[in-house]
Amino acid sequence: MSYKGDIKSVRVTATGAVFAGRTRLRGIILASDGGGAGTIILQDNTDSTTLFQADVPTGDVFSVNFPEDGILFKGGMKVSTITNIDAATLLIDN
């Protein structure tokens, strides 16, 4: 699979804004911290609409690349929930 434009990786370990402007989620890698099943919720930064939610089993790694245009975050992207995840690497449009 190839992407139509430049992407960048952003590593997050806590809740908060990831990117202020319009962007697309192209892929994600989650690493459990071993303390239980992990959860991450990504929302639009302006209207708090949940656009992606994933769980990762205890002690495991979850990875996915989204086909074609990925998931559009029109108002930017924020992490609203991140529990039992050591780190998340988000692949987004540059």
Question: What do the PLM-derived regions correspond to, one by one?
Answer:
Residues 1-94:
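Surface-exposed, low-hydrophobicity beta-strand/loop segments enriched in small/polar/acidic residues
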